[in-house]
Amino acid sequence: MNEFDKKPEFLTYQSDKMENYLYDYVLSYDGKTSKYINNYFGWDNSHSNNLDNKYSGKAFRPSICILICTSLAGTLEMALPPSISVELVHNFSLIHDDIEDNDKVRRHKPTLWTVWGIPKAIITGNSILVLGNKVLNEMLSNGSSKNDLY
């Protein structure tokens, strides 16, 4: 692990909250790609050398989302749904990028496509994108305005 793999200290609290929210949200999804999504995030024991099975992303983007929201008089609770949406969309792009670039390792473990094959990796990435969009749609259906999302 080098200095760029570590989470900046000031982001730890926000990213820990986001990771817990992300975990709960994704685990509530019970679709055909659930097992592949859980594998990708390291929340299972298969095909992973991540000993504590904790999500190992730096969570920089969602932490910035949380910091912006809270600095504009929002609360952490208000910021969590859009922050995980940002993280889900980012991870969708990483799965597809790994395939395009023929990358075999991400976050110190085999990439999704090398473990499960390209078709399952593409569908799993797409499912993660759908989850990211679903979070925002749920905010709108729960009374948030489009302006709240910006």
Predicted regions and their residues:
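Conserved N-terminal diphosphate/IPP-binding helix and adjacent helical/loop segment
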Residues: 1-89, 95, 99-114
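A short hydrophobic/aromatic micro-motif that marks alpha-helical segments and, especially, helix-coil
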Residues: 45, 112, 133-134, 141
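Inter-helical turn/loop segments and adjacent helix faces that build the functional surface
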Residues: 71-75, 135-150
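Membrane-interface starts of transmembrane alpha-helices
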Residues: 79, 117, 121, 145-150
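Short amphipathic alpha-helical interface segments enriched in basic and hydrophobic/aromatic residues
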Residues: 90-94, 133, 137
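Multi-pass membrane catalytic core of lipid/isoprenoid biosynthesis enzymes
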Residues: 114-134
